[in-house]
């Protein structure tokens, strides 16, 4: 890394007019709340929680866990996407809780927490493709563009930044299946629910 420190490529380009493959590990991407809210509205038609406009976040930044550099300033920690922002989960659950009959003022019980987690990751599983769809190109198209020797200067760097954002979104998408598996109801719970429904 240079003396500018661990900056994502979008900041490097904006501040200093260049990009670097070494900084790709620090890349970030913003997910606007309106995409998330739209996804929630499609899935939940019941009464949803209302957010305080002054406290709600209008967008959330996704980033990798990049670790800290060692004493020599070199970072050998593998950069990896390991979590969505906590504030994002809180805001989503605040909205979907009432639609799932969860009293968010009292707080969810253990079973409800699990249900909320599952619903949250199902929402994010739909949000990421929606965010990717906002770009005019795919990862593969950007990679092809960067192979073109005629693509120069700031245009090339802008494509490089855009590609870095998409790669991070794809990593976030790949992180989700394990979370869905972790929070999905056990088979016995499902069978118990279906037995209760049949009794009714």
Region locations from a protein language model:
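Short, charged beta-turn/beta-strand-edge "cap" motif at the junction between a beta-strand
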Residues: 1-11
């Amino acid at each position: 890394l240079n003396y500018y420190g661990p900056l994502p490529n979008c900041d490097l380009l904006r501040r200093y007019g260049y990009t670097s493959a070494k900084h790709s590990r620090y890349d970030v991407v913003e997910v606007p709340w309106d995409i998330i809210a739209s996804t929630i509205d499609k899935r939940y038609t019941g009464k949803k929680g209302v957010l305080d406009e002054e406290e709600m976040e209008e967008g959330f930044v996704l980033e990798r866990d990049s670790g800290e550099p060692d004493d020599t300033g070199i970072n050998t920690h593998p950069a990896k996407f390991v979590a969505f922002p906590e504030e994002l989960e809180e805001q989503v659950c605040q909205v979907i809780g009432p639609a799932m009959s969860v009293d968010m003022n009292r707080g969810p019980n253990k079973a409800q927490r699990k249900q909320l987690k599952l619903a949250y990751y199902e929402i994010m599983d739909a949000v990421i493709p929606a965010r990717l769809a906002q770009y005019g190109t795919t990862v593969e198209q950007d990679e092809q563009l960067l192979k073109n020797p005629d693509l120069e200067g700031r245009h090339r760097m802008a494509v490089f930044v855009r590609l870095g954002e998409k790669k991070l979104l794809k990593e976030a998408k790949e992180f989700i299946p394990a979370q869905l598996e972790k929070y999905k109801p056990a088979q016995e719970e499902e069978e118990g629910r279906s037995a209760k429904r049949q009794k009714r």
